[in-house]
């Protein structure tokens, strides 16, 4: 009797699991679609920074936002691992991160060129180029050393 009862309970449990298969696939696909979405709507500054302090603040804000982007990408990859790995979704997540970095660089490049054109002193221009180059390196690599280099160079430029 115990064996029959155990068999019935086990069969019921397995049939219940089998019935959830299609529903789980729909849920999994919905999660894949959500993880694959990419928002490239990165705000361009409403007004171009007019002085070195404003430009330094702009670069620092963009660096912080890029770090937040990297955090979101990492969390999406972790969620993907929990849901079930899918190569095309992983590629979409990685591509989104790259596209967001490139969009930030493109926006900042336009601002940088405008600030550079308005900078007259050779030392200040050198510090500006150095700070912007360190910012680009940090945005690309997101390493602690690159962050330290960026912070140092942008502080020097801002306080000239």
Please tell me what each predicted stretch does:
Residues 2, 19-29, 47-50, 94-106, ...:
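Intrinsic low-complexity, intrinsically disordered segments enriched in polar/basic residues
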Residues 15-16:
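C-terminal motif of bacterial Sec signal peptides marking the signal peptidase cleavage site
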Residues 63-70, 77, 119, 139-146, ...:
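Sec/Tat-exported extracytoplasmic proteins
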Residues 21-92:
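Immediate post-signal-peptide N-terminus of mature secreted/exported proteins
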């Amino acid at each position: 009797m115990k064996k029959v009862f155990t068999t019935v309970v086990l069969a019921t449990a397995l049939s219940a699991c089998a019935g959830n298969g299609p529903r789980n696939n729909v849920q999994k696909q919905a999660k894949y679609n959500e993880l694959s979405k990419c928002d490239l709507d990165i705000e361009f500054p409403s007004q171009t920074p007019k002085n070195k302090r404003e430009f330094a603040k702009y670069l620092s804000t963009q660096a912080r936002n890029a770090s937040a982007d990297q955090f979101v990408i990492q969390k999406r990859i972790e969620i993907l691992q929990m849901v079930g790995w899918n190569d095309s979704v992983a590629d979409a997540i990685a591509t989104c991160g790259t596209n967001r970095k490139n969009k930030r660089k493109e926006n900042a490049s336009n601002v940088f060129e405008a600030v550079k054109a308005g900078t007259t002193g050779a030392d200040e221009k050198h510090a500006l180029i150095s700070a912007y180059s360190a910012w680009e390196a940090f945005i690309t690599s997101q390493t602690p050393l690159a962050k330290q280099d960026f912070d140092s160079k942008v502080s020097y430029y801002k306080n000239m």
